[in-house]
A protein has these predicted regions:
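N-terminal membrane-anchoring/stem segments of glycan-assembly enzymes
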Residues: 1-39
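Membrane-embedded multi-pass helical conduit in multi-pass membrane proteins
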Residues: 3, 39, 245-319
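Cell-envelope/extracellular polymer assembly enzymes that use nucleotide-activated donors
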Residues: 43-48, 72, 178
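Short, acidic, metal-binding catalytic loop of nucleotide-sugar glycosyltransferases
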Residues: 61-70
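Short, conserved alpha-helix that lines the donor NDP-sugar binding/gating region
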Residues: 79-84, 180-181
Length: 319
């Protein structure tokens, strides 16, 4: 009986990461979902530059250089005050750092022709090309868009219908994610626009400290949206794409420990534990190699770094 219980727990610990990274995208790929209309009429827009570091001078110039008719531009650290004082029908939020594509504003507002759409998320990319993990996340967002339930947004570019803009509580760490979850909870559709692009000026792998900071923001959101865990509007995406990922570090740790305990019940469990150990050691040993082999192991290293950043992230969410 003990072996059966441990084996079930071991299986569940491996299944949950498999579900969130493999089965969940497969379910999203099923041929169903919503179709959204696009319009050619350009609504009034207020561009709000409120994320990242900078005085706003360069970004204001690049935004106004898009030539969007009647554009209002606001530079402010206070997102609530900026939104409240804006006159645009559509509020477009931007950061200071990324480069804005000249057609981004025109493209991102097209989907607001469909009255179901309350928020549109733009695409952040790099002119040097994005990594495999980021391409995977972008693909998942595109599939989520079919259901009007894109989970999260890039601070570099997203837009919200003014009458759907919620108030952001103080000390929220991940404002774009909070807004996407809150708007979905309120009944609005959140969709993805791959033609509304921003470009990273610097490419590179985020530091572990940055990943921990991001994880802290997600843990905070976990406490802000408890109702989204229980079969509410958007729960399928919120749990499948986000919540299960936040616990992958725990799943992998539990799988290793349950496997270790199962070694007392037969050689097959010893082999499985050895395979786990070889996998982790190989990731750290071979991810520094150049070429295709090293590239594959760097993807796994990135996966482990992102997953285990949620452990220390639990303890800094309110700092």
């Amino acid at each position: 009986m003990t072996e059966i219980v441990l084996a079930v727990l071991f299986g569940v610990s491996l299944f949950l990461p498999f579900y969130t990274y493999v089965l969940y995208p497969l379910l999203l790929s099923l041929p169903r979902g919503k179709k959204y209309s696009e319009g050619d009429v350009l609504p009034s827009v207020t561009a709000i530059v409120c994320f990242g570091e900078g005085d706003g001078t360069a970004k204001r110039a690049s935004v106004e250089a898009t030539g969007y008719p009647g554009l209002e531009t606001v530079v402010s650290r206070d997102i609530n005050a900026a939104a409240a004082s804006s006159s645009g029908e559509i509020l477009v939020f931007l950061d200071h750092e990324t480069e804005l594509d000249p057609d981004a504003l025109r493209n991102i507002v097209k989907l607001f022709a469909d009255k179901r759409v309350a928020m549109v998320v733009g695409e952040q990319t790099s002119r040097e090309g994005s990594g495999a993990f980021w391409k995977y996340e972008t693909k998942v967002r595109r599939m989520e868009s079919k259901f009007g339930s894109v989970s999260g947004a890039n601070a570099s570019l997203f837009a919200i219908r003014r009458d759907a803009m919620p108030t952001v509580p103080e000390k929220v760490r991940n404002v774009p994610f909070y807004l996407s979850a809150k708007i979905k909870q309120n009944g609005g559709d959140v969709v993805y626009c791959p033609d509304a692009k921003t470009y990273e000026k610097k490419s590179g792998t985020p530091t572990f400290r940055k990943r921990v900071s991001d994880a802290a923001g997600y843990w905070q959101a976990f406490g802000l949206f408890p109702g989204m865990l229980f079969f509410r509007r958007g729960s399928f995406v919120y749990v499948g794409h986000r919540v299960l990922k936040w616990f992958v570090w725990l799943d992998l740790t539990a799988a290793f420990l349950f496997n270790a305990a199962l070694c007392f019940f037969g050689w097959i469990w010893i082999v499985l534990l050895a395979l786990q150990a070889v996998f982790y050691l190989s990731v750290f040993a071979f991810s520094r190699l150049k070429g295709g082999v090293g590239g594959i192991f760097r993807v796994f290293r990135y996966f482990l770094a992102v997953s285990f950043a949620f452990l220390p992230g639990m303890f800094v969410q309110n700092q």
